[in-house]
Amino acid sequence: MRKGILCVILGCFFSILCHGQVSFGVNASITSSTLSENFAKSKTGIQIGVLCNYELNEDLTLLSGLGYVVKGVNGLWSDLNYSQQLKMFDVQLSYLELPLSLGYKIPIGNNIRLIPNVGIFLSYGLHGHSEIKSINFEAEEVFRFADNSWNPFKDEKFNDWAQTTVNAFERWDYGVRSGLNIEAGNIICHGAYDLGFNKVWNGYGKMGNALKSRSLIIGIGYKF
């Protein structure tokens, strides 16, 4: 149901673009992402893409574009903590992402304006990488298992540790976005926070809980 509503909204947006004044640009950002669970630790990634904005009137603007974004999560395998040697689960996820936000333009100087904005985002997982790191507290060292990397968009079963299955991440993600842009001429500085609605990961086998994505984005762009 939510996916259908998002598709309708995006379809209306692109129909508007065909009949109005549109500006384009490019941007690059740093991301910090995690999941909605206490064990999850944030992971730093990047985002690069194109901007596509539509001026509704003197006060309102639609902000959109298309980007390649790298997200992920770090966290301890607390469910499998049988000894002093823990296993750390690292995930890197790459998405094609389409945001759509409504912004309100606030002039604060000569050709400078603030644009607080709220909207939605829709992402599709292209590829990813997962691996387990071992933390040996007695030796105070961290080392990687060479044979324990896999595609996080597919289920992975480990027979060595209580026949544990790491469930696949969902490729589709969507949710709400709130942000703030600062435009100075053709330069755009932007920040946003994404709150995912889709349950992108169900954890380990039947033991896990459905988790949702959380992302902080800070970047800079140039409008042609």
Placement of each model-derived feature along the sequence:
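Short glycine/proline- and aromatic-enriched beta-strand/turn motifs that initiate or cap beta-hairpins
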Residues: G20-L51
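Glycine- and aromatic-enriched membrane insertion/assembly motifs of diderm outer-membrane
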Residues: A40-M88, L93-L96, F224
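Predominantly the C-terminal beta-signal and adjacent terminal strand-loop region
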Residues: L76-W77, T164-V166, R171-F224
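Outer-membrane beta-barrel translocator domains and adjoining extracellular loop/strand segments
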Residues: S36-K43, N74-N81, G128-N136, W201-K206
